[in-house]
């Protein structure tokens, strides 16, 4: 079960860009799995269930965060992403994560989820289509828009040409 906990927490952290929200999503996924008697068997359908459920709860967390911000209930909450990197000492790592989180802030929840699963988690597109229950053309469209958003954020710093290096760095560090 430890293997799936790592996968859930990594995916949720990359989608939400927030450690606290990621931990909450991880706890809720595991509680729901226990309640529904879903057992992680190392892969296959159970792994897809955990990933699908993680993505659903992340979407709900983003929507809740956006609603709290829009209704002026909590102005300290970012609309989608809050780049909290206090635990990192390296300036380059902090800056890269902040660039990623700002790019995520400009994406729709589905764009972020598709990008994380396909690009950062290296899941095959056919499997992501099944998990998210979307068509191939919809997934391609989501990925193009997400990639364009990250490239645009990198262009602000004059680093648009370093997209592949940036993605490799994010995968390695987070």
Residue ranges and their predicted role:
Residues 41, 52-74:
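Arg/Lys-rich amphipathic alpha helix in sigma70-family domain 2
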Residues 1-10, 20-23, 34, 46:
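A short, charge-rich alpha-helical start-of-domain segment used by transcription regulators
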Residues 114-118:
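A short pre-motif secondary-structure segment
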Residues 68-93, 170-171:
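Internal acidic/polar
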Residues 27-45, 65:
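Sigma70-family region 2
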Residues 94, 104-112:
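Short helix-coil-helix linker/hinge
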Residues 126-163:
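DNA-recognition helix of helix-turn-helix
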């Amino acid at each position: 079960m430890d293997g799936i906990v790592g996968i859930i927490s990594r995916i949720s952290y990359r989608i939400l860009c927030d450690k606290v929200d990621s931990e909450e999503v991880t706890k809720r996924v595991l509680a729901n799995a226990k309640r529904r008697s879903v057992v992680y068997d190392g892969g296959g359908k159970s792994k897809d269930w955990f990933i699908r459920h993680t993505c659903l709860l992340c979407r709900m967390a983003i929507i809740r965060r956006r609603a709290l911000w829009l209704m002026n209930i909590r102005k300290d909450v970012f609309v989608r992403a809050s780049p909290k990197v206090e635990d990192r000492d390296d300036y380059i790592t902090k800056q890269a994560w902040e660039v990623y989180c700002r790019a995520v802030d400009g994406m729709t929840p589905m764009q972020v989820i598709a990008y994380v699963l396909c690009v950062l988690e290296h899941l095959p597109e056919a499997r992501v289509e099944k998990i998210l229950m979307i068509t191939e053309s919809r997934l391609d469209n989501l990925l193009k828009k997400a990639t364009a958003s990250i490239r645009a954020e990198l262009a602000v710093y004059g680093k648009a040409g370093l997209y592949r290096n940036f993605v490799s760095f994010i995968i390695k560090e987070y």
